[in-house]
């Protein structure tokens, strides 16, 4: 039985479970009856590691990373990969309008944006084009579909999640971030207030255990 009191952060929690479950499925993606896809713990761990390496190359420790996606396996992979890379996840509702995203981006100044599809990027595109502090944009769906019919100022900013997870891992690669403890920020949640703009609330790794 795992004692979460012995864990320092959410990455350790995942790795602990991944080592036990390994070949078992963690996700079932059901797009339609003839299109089902499963992901094992082992496969998910590798995908987190591959993505985290690319993120780490493009952010500094403590940088915010905006995550705009529906609930899907890649959301989970992205969230953990950001933490492993030393970033702080800023998840955003997919129901936000363009002005909401603009406010969020100006408030938290993310170095990286992860976006799922064309519909979402349409609402983010103007802000991404305007803000130099956004170094990279990673698309969860195939990159050409996500960027279709959009005016991108800098196409070099854009990376494809699906190509990233095709990368090979080195023998010594493993998931860890020894700098994270229970007081370290895990994410910034923007909550809708009764009036005015949403307020960002920092949630720590320890706070997620409670």
PLM segments and residue spans:
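Flexible, non-catalytic linker and terminal segments flanking ANL/adenylate-forming cores
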Residues: 1-12, 31
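AMP-dependent adenylate-forming
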Residues: 13-40, 145
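Adenylate-forming
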Residues: 14-18, 28, 44, 48, ...
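Conserved pre-ATP/AMP-binding loop-to-beta segment of ANL
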Residues: 24-26, 158-159, 166-190, 197
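Conserved AMP-binding/adenylate-forming
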Residues: 37-38, 52-96
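Conserved AMP-binding A3 loop
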Residues: 38-42, 186-210
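Short beta-strand elements of ligand-binding domains
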Residues: 69, 92-93, 134-143
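Conserved ATP-dependent adenylate/AMP-binding module captured primarily in the ANL superfamily
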Residues: 96-127
């Amino acid at each position: 039985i795992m004692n979460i009191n012995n864990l320092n952060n959410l990455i350790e929690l995942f790795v602990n479970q991944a080592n036990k479950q390994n070949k078992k499925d963690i996700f079932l993606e059901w797009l339609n009856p003839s299109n089902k896809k499963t992901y094992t713990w082992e496969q998910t761990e590798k995908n987190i590691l591959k993505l985290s390496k690319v993120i780490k190359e493009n952010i500094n420790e403590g940088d915010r990373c905006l995550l705009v996606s529906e609930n899907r396996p890649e959301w989970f992979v992205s969230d953990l990969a950001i933490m492993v890379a030393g970033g702080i996840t800023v998840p955003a509702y997919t129901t936000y309008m363009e002005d909401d995203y603009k406010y969020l981006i100006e408030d938290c100044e993310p170095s990286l944006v992860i976006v799922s599809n064309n519909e979402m990027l349409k609402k983010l595109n103007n802000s991404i084009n305007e803000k130099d502090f956004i170094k990279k944009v990673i698309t969860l769906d195939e990159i050409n579909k996500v960027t279709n019919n959009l005016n991108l100022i800098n196409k070099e900013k854009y990376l494809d999640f699906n190509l990233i997870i095709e990368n090979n891992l080195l023998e010594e690669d493993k998931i860890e971030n020894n700098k994270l403890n229970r007081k370290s920020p895990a994410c910034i949640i923007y909550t809708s207030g009764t009036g005015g703009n949403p307020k960002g609330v920092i949630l720590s790794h320890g706070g997620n255990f409670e």
